Amino acid sequence: MHIAIAGNIGSCKTTLTKMLAAHYGWTPKFESVDYNPYLADFYDDMERWSFNLQVYFLNKRFKDVVDISKLDEVIIQDRTIYEDARIFAPNLHGMGLMSTRDFENYSDLFDLMMSLVNPPDLLIYLRSSIPNLIGQIQKRGREYEKSIRIDYITGLNERYEHWIKDYKHNLLILDVDRIKFENRPEDFQEVIDKIDAELFGLFPNE
């Protein structure tokens, strides 16, 4: 089984991935950012490095999905392949930070990849406001994120909402402005109840 967590930068995807993996005994699949050879350069010069970064992410994410499909265990994935193609690349193109030529090339590659893999059994989307995202980004203090522009985060958030509205597969939306699962046990239990309802047909606690 493949469970995937989607959400903007700073929406606590990795935190929830770790907590759910520990609770259910699932195997976590984390987004690798520490060894990305393009990330720091991208945040310094988005237009120059946007295509390189997105192709790098797409390649890694596709490999992850293929690997997950071969496993019998339950995998919970931190970020999805959809977000690269439906959120980040279109946002860069819309901001004039990726050329139309590069964007079309990238999109064709994504479409080919998606014809070869299945969607997650459940997608968990972490919905968040901009102030909450900025607060989380500042709180974790990653050096390469210090130069992220607020208009970049805002553009991503708008595209996330459009994408989720049209998503056609199994979906659970969590409002992380309200549900503070990291710090409040009762909120984490609410998340568990909702997931159990989606996966096992159990009614969540009201």
Language model feature labels by segment:
Residues 5:
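Hydrophobic anchor at the beta1->P-loop junction of P-loop NTPases
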Residues 8:
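P-loop (Walker A) phosphate-binding loop of NTP-binding proteins
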Residues 13:
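Conserved lysine of the Walker
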Residues 16-17:
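Post-Walker A alpha-helix
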Residues 22-60:
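Conserved substrate/cofactor phosphate-moiety recognition/catalytic segment
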Residues 61-101:
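A basic- and aromatic-enriched beta-loop-alpha substructure that forms the phosphate/nucleotide-
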Residues 86-159:
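A glycine- and Lys/Arg-enriched "phosphate-lid" helix/loop adjacent to the NTP-binding pocket
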Residues 134-206:
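NTP-dependent small-molecule kinase module
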